Curated annotation (Swiss-Prot):
It comes from Oryza sativa subsp. japonica. PANTHER family: EXPANSIN-B3, EXPANSIN-B8. This is Expansin-B8. Residues 68-174 form the Expansin-like EG45 domain. InterPro entries: Expan_Lol_pI (IPR007118), Expansin/allergen_DPBB_dom (IPR007112), Expansin_CBD (IPR007117), Expansin_CBD_sf (IPR036749), LolPI (IPR005795), RlpA-like_DPBB (IPR009009), RlpA-like_sf (IPR036908). Residues 1-25 form the signal peptide. Keywords: Cell wall, Cell wall biogenesis/degradation, Disulfide bond, Glycoprotein, Membrane, Secreted, Signal. The lineage of its organism: Eukaryota, Viridiplantae, Streptophyta, Embryophyta, Tracheophyta.
């Protein structure tokens, strides 16, 4: 077999791996949501870049079987994500700091493409990139790029060329939320941060204790995805205030968001949100 034939075989084996395995498994989808600002892009007018797109999971699924993937977000098939999610390779996932960021994606080179842009959020890691920027979309998000009645035709293409642009996220009716992760204890706290308007991502999280420890912000460490943790040498004193900083440097403080009687595996919604 000549080298050219070997290259073709390797390409199609990779295609099968990406399309069939993708990031993870699948989950059901219910309805539609709108949680982005389609009138503007981060930094001004939309700057469209080129990327490859594939899809994974079920044809009408939200992607990850565990409802979250490498970012840790829960129930991405429900509001506000409504299954419009994507795995991103490293330039998009950014080692977890890209989790929650929003992108407009469109395609027009395949006959089944509508050319209409759809917005997806980065909720998982793409381990098999095919280009510098690679969106491994949920089945439903990939299908939304197609003309009416052509979603299955587009999915059968497997790999398509797309254009993308970063846009602000908007989560109508939601405040920034903090999910205290399983395994948290009086000396260890891990929280998942989600639903941030604007950048949508988190670059740094700090915690302030009550009582004697109050008044001093302690940096938390990124554990994985959008989960941040604090390993303490003393019993942490609740309630906890949390300060988050976005990739663009915007800060937001959620005072006493985690109460005195907090418990692991519990979601706590704040009363604060980034302005649109």
């Amino acid at each position: 077999m000549v080298s050219g034939d070997v290259g073709v075989v390797v390409y199609y084996l990779l295609l099968v791996l990406v399309v069939v395995q993708g990031c993870k498994g699948s989950s059901a989808v219910q309805g539609e949501g709108r949680w982005y600002n389609e009138s503007e892009a981060i930094g001004g007018a939309a700057a469209w870049g080129n990327a490859k797109a594939t899809w994974y999971g079920q044809p009408n699924g939200a992607g990850a079987a565990d409802n979250g993937g490498a970012c840790g977000f829960k129930k991405v098939n429900q509001y506000p994500f409504m299954g419009m999610t994507s795995c991103g390779n490293q330039p998009l996932y950014k080692g977890g700091k890209g989790c929650g960021s929003c992108y407009r994606v469109r395609c027009n080179r395949n006959p089944a493409c509508s050319g209409n842009a759809q917005t997806v959020a980065i909720t998982d890691m793409n381990y098999f990139p095919l280009s510098q920027y690679h969106f491994d979309l949920s089945g439903i998000a990939f299908g939304r790029l197609a003309k009416p009645g052509r979603a299955d035709d587009l999915r059968r293409a497997g790999i398509i060329d797309v254009q993308f642009a970063r846009v602000p996220c908007e989560f109508p009716g939601l405040k920034v939320g903090f999910h205290v992760e399983e395994g948290s204890s009086p000396v260890y706290l891990a929280v998942l941060v989600e639903y941030e308007n604007g950048d949508g991502d988190v670059a740094q999280v700090d915690l302030k204790e009550a009582g004697a420890g109050g008044g001093r912000w302690t940096p938390m460490r990124e554990s994985w995805g959008s989960v941040w943790r604090l390993d303490s040498n003393h019993r942490l004193r609740a309630p906890f205030s949390i300060r988050i900083r976005s990739d663009s440097g915007k800060t937001l403080v959620a005072p006493d968001v985690i109460p005195l009687n907090w418990t692991p595996n519990t979601f706590y919604r704040s009363f604060v949100q980034y302005s649109s």
